[in-house]
Structure formats: structure tokens, C-alpha cells
Amino acid sequence: MSVKHVSVLLLLLQLSCCFRTGSCGKVLVWPMDFSLWMNLNVILDELVRRGHEVIVLRNSASIFIDPSKQANIKFETFPIAATKDDLEDLFVHYVSTWTNARQNSQWKYFSLLQKLFSEYSDSCENACKEVVFNKTLMTKLQESRFDILLSDAIGPCGELLAELLKIPFVYSLRFTPGYTMEKYSGGLSVPPSYVPIILSDLSGKMTFMERVNNMLCMLYFDFWFQMFNKKRWDQFYSEVLGRPVTFSELVGKADMWLIRSYWDLEFPRPTLPNIQFVGGLHCKPAKPLPKEMEEFVQSSGEEGVVVFSLGSMVSNMTEERANLIASAFAQLPQKVIWRFDGQKPETLGPNTRIYDWIPQNDLLGHPKTKAFVTHGGANGIYEAIHHGIPMVGLPLFGEQPDNIAHMTAKGAAIRLNWKTMSSEDLLNALKTVINDPSYKENVMTLSSIHHDQPMKPLDRAVFWIEYVMRHKGAKHLRVAAHDLTWFQYHSLDVVGFLVSCAAFLIFLVIKSYLFVYQKLVKIGKKQKRD
């Protein structure tokens, strides 16, 4: 078949998708970089496959968002003052600070986290200004007549663009610190009695003191911590729109929240019709490994292989730490595939091979893989769940400790402290998850839960995006809580009214009693005088 015929066939296939869903739409994307882009990119590829036109706004210093690698997606690049090296240095600073901050007390850790997010908020604001104050770009966007905007709630500005372009918008996100945006802008209920607050490192089965800690974490994030400088963002958004408006108000206009989690990783909690859980949307069947890697895996025999990766966002490791890990791996009967771009450790055993990059999903889906040593990023966790591989967690930053805490509580992982673990600790943890059948059984149960859904996570995410496009929004799915003040939401006005009524009734009863009593006393005195 000629290239021309193939192109026509693909076009007809796209058009058939449009006919099924009603129409093809134009999607504007305000993305985040690094692993957040990888998650969003999976959705965008599926939207394009279904015939939609996707345009991504990217800044000139983007690291992972590379137009040359995606011919099927259009990109609109806007200039910013920072360079690619500046952003890489900034990101390394964020990761290093966040990782090291965990060694402090919880409250010192939260204080350092606040400072980190203040810096992040400033960089987001600068990027947003480069877009909304770029008249040429904004005119082009307005003339494009988009049907929907897709963004990550962790990177503000998408909601402002949607307001300026007068189009509905959908969030794709893993979490915001303390679930504050999900609660106060999305209307999501998070009872601290049984729902662990994100970044608290707690699981769904909490002791009394853990529930106390969970409550304190919630209060801290609610009343002290600010992910973004709301006063500045309120002022900025009001200036751009020419009317008083708040950051939370615009965020609350989101038509749909696509949360990249599911009940295999999360614990049960209340939810809403415009909040959909789509964890593991990037998961897919394993493909064949490269020939050399497949030969190494097959050479492991019955013992199998262990896969170790700290993900795409962590590349630096001290020589001492690398030697400690290599020493533990060298004592295993299994073969080990390690993603590592540092200097070769002196203690590296003949059973271990190092690669700058590995096909992680394909390795985890290989029948000879016995265990996965991971930093606990949501992408890796979900690939392990998808393929049913027990884990040893070495959480570093972000929600990684929470993810590993959840997997540990579900009996699918063992958690170690990255800073304090010894070579023996890592060796024993790996032996346990490989040789104790309960870990494999538990993760296979989670895998069964993950696969047993009426619709695949990716299909569900795309369905709701198309749903919002078809209905030009999804305001009918938003709860009335968005229109209530905080005291109305908690029914304090109703409680106050009922208490007032009860107090008034008690007052009337007491007054009536006193009146009758005084009358009876007067009658008694009169009878005595007579």
C-alpha cells in the first residue's frame, strides 16, 4: 500500500472517531514539564488519534516538551527570559531541597516546603505573564476558537487563559499539597478522620495519634501553607481581567478534574461527579525488550531479575550511595537491571548491568521480573501494579512517601529510608519481597483491581474531555458548594438559627414557669392572709 493510501486511511479513521463522538474539537493545552508532561502527553496522543486538533503552549526553555519528537501535535512556543539550563538548575534545586528537607522535623520540613513553593509560584507567574501580555499570541489564540483547555492544576495560568478565551477547561493532576485546591476550589470532601492528607506520609489505617497528626497536617495546609502566593495571584488575575477576581474563584470554574490515581493506590473516600480518578492511564502491555537486554534477562534462569530506577526526575547520586546499593545487588542470586547515569560503582557485581535508560514498562511486564526498586513516583508505582510486581520503596520527595506508605499498608511493598539505609537493609528487603509469597499475592490483587474497570483509565479520561466539549462545559456536574460561603458550607448559619430557636424556646419555657410560679406564690400568700 502506498504512503498516499495509508494517509487517506488514517484520515478516514480519524473522521470515523469524529462521527462517533459528534465532532472533532480544538484543544488548547497549558502543560507542565518533566514527568507531568509525560502523563499529559499520553492523553494528547489519544485525543489526536481520535481526530482532535491539539495545540500545546510551551515556553522557549522547555526541557521535556520537544516539538521535534511529536509531529502529530502542534506547538505554540512563547519566549521567556530563562534558558533551558536555568530551568534544569532550578529543578535540580527543587528536588535537592525537597529531598534533604525530609530529614528535618515535620514542621521544619513544611516550613522549607513553603519557601520552595514560594519560589515556584514566582516562576509560574513570570511564565504566565509572558503569555497573557503577549498581544500577538493572545490574538492568535482568540481567533483559533478553541473548544476546551487542558492543564495541570499544579501549574497555574490555565484557568486564566480559559477565562480570557471564554472556553471550558479540564484539570489533569496527581495532587496539590494538602488537597487544598481540590477541597476549596473543587469541592472535594476530605474527612481527616479516615482520609490521609497528602504529604503526611500516612496510610488509610491510622492509629489515634496518626489521626491527630493527620488533623494537624490538614489545619496547617488549610490555614498557613500557601502553594501559591494567593494575594499576588488575585491581584494579577484581577489586573488581567479588569475586574476583582480571586485565584480560587477561577480554579473553581474547572468543569472536570482528572485525578491520576485510583482505588488500587488510594483508600476509599467521598468524591464528586466532576472528579474522575484515572490513575495508570499511561500503562500498557509490555513490548519485547532490545535483543541484548533480553539475552541478559533470559540468562537469569529461574531466579529472575530485579529492576531498579529512580525515574526521570532524579539523576544525581553520591558515589558512596551508589556503592552501597551496588554491594547489596551483588549479593542477590537474581540478575539486576539498574537505570543509572553516574560513574560505575566499584562494588558493582557481575549480576548487575547499568543503563542510561531502560524500557521500564516492558521490563516490569517481563515474566522473569521478580521485584522493582523504586523511588515511589506515581508512574512507576502504577506500572508495577499494572504488571503485578512487588516493590521496595526508596521515597525521595513529593508524594512519593505517601505512595510507598499506601503500598506498604496494602502489603505490596517494603519501605526503606534513602538517607539511612544500609546495604544489608536493601538486601534483606529485596529477599523478603521476592521470597515471601504474600507480597506477590497482594500486588496481584491490586493488579486485578486495576484491570477490572468498566473503562480503561485513558479511555475514561478522554471520554470526559470529549464530554465537556460536547456539552460546552459540565456545570451541571458541579456541586452547589461552589456558591456557598464557608459558614454556609458547614451549615453554621443553620446551626446558629436552630440554636437561637432552641434558646428562645427555653427562654419562653423559663419565663412561663417563672410567671406561673409567681402567680402561685401570690395566690398562696393571699390565702394565708385570708
From Swiss-Prot:
UDPGT is of major importance in the conjugation and subsequent elimination of potentially toxic xenobiotics and endogenous compounds. SUPFAM superfamilies: UDP-Glycosyltransferase/glycogen phosphorylase. It is found in: Microsome membrane; Endoplasmic reticulum membrane. Belongs to the UDP-glycosyltransferase family. It catalyses: glucuronate acceptor + UDP-alpha-D-glucuronate = acceptor beta-D-glucuronoside + UDP + H(+). PANTHER family: EG:EG0003.4 PROTEIN-RELATED, UDP-GLUCURONOSYLTRANSFERASE 2B4. Keywords: Endoplasmic reticulum, Glycoprotein, Glycosyltransferase, Membrane, Microsome, Signal, Transferase, Transmembrane, Transmembrane helix. Residues 1-24 form the signal peptide. It comes from the Eukaryota. It comes from Oryctolagus cuniculus (Rabbit). The chain crosses the membrane at residues 494-510. This is UDP-glucuronosyltransferase 2B14. PROSITE patterns: UDPGT.
